[in-house]
């Protein structure tokens, strides 16, 4: 589960940067 946390943060960061 801990491995999914940084992946989720990375995805959110990528989306925020795209916006």
Curated annotation (Swiss-Prot):
The GO cellular component terms are: extracellular region
Name of the protein in its database record = Phylloseptin-J5
Q: What does this protein do?
A: Has antimicrobial activity.
Give UniProt keywords alphabetically: Amidation, Amphibian defense peptide, Antimicrobial, Secreted
Give the record's family classification.
Answer: Belongs to the frog skin active peptide (FSAP) family. Phylloseptin subfamily.
Q: What is its main location?
A: secreted
Subcellular localization is given as:
Secreted
Source species of the chain: Phasmahyla jandaia
- Please list the tissues where expression of this protein has been recorded: Expressed by the skin glands.
What GO biological process terms does the UniProt entry carry, in alphabetical order? defense response
Residues recorded with modification Leucine amide: 19
């Amino acid at each position: 589960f801990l491995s999914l946390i940084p992946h989720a943060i990375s995805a959110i960061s990528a989306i925020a940067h795209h916006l």
